[in-house]
Amino acid sequence: MCIRDRNSSASVAFVAPTNNGGSSITGYTVTSSPGGITATGTTSPINVTGLTNGTAYTFTIVATNAIGNSSPSTASSAVTPLVPFTCGTSTVADIDVNSYNTVLIGTQCWTKSNLKVTKYNDGTAIPDETANTAGWAGLTTGARSDYTGAASYIATYGYLYNWYAAKGVSTSGSTTYKNICPTDWHVPTDGEWTALETQLGGFSVAGGKMKSTGTTLWNSPNGGANNSSGFSALPGGQRLSPASVDIGNEASFWSATTDVTTGGGGWAWFRGLSRLSGFLNIASTSKDMGQSVRCLKD
């Protein structure tokens, strides 16, 4: 028996014998557990509707012929119907169960706020190096930092991650990368950031279309900001060594792409937004810089 889960329903496929005990089979009844929801048909597959999204179900099948009903089949493996993901209305959760709204920009689906996860999506911890004022710049594995140590900062701006965390480098020198983003999401490449820039009309206006408006979180003048894309960028600042800087003034987002021409492989591309203009700036910087992370759906 093979089950394919769908929104509030399941398609139950099975090998359908033509007779049972010498008499032709005239129909099949599929029954869910829990709920006892039934559906009938004369061949495989049979679609069972009226299921509750988020509930795990198993299914049994009974065959019917002129003699009567067969015994129920062995129960299937459990399946859980889920609401289909729709970018812009659906949310996505990280391994810490932080929930992120999503926004569709062109054909790209982005998280609408900065990442605030403390683990890679396999459960491996990302060390908190906020207090490591002397050693932050020498790190070559993933690390995170917050600006003030206040929970309210993390809730609003997320963590600042070095590039190694954004790339998923948990062991120095490793080329086997973990994923800091939720399953089916990833840190965008430099090329994917460029696609966003193009979609929004080019670097000279894209930043304004990405920045949240007003001067409550952005410092004045928050030039060019209209947030027409819904990206809702906030000025979380950066982590340098030994401290964090530019909260309210700058938003910086890692790409997953190394700058192969600068820094001997120790630099990577990022995108930056400033309070002063509506530009979307492209630059590269040392991988030990702490910056915000946004995730892009696969």
Where in this protein do the model-derived segments appear?
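Beta-strand-rich modules
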Residues: 48-70
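Conserved positions within compact, well-structured domain cores
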Residues: 84-298
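Strand-loop-strand motifs at the edges of beta-sheets in extracellular beta-sandwich domains
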Residues: 12, 45-47
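Short beta-strand elements bearing conserved aromatic residues within extracellular beta-rich modules
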Residues: 27-30
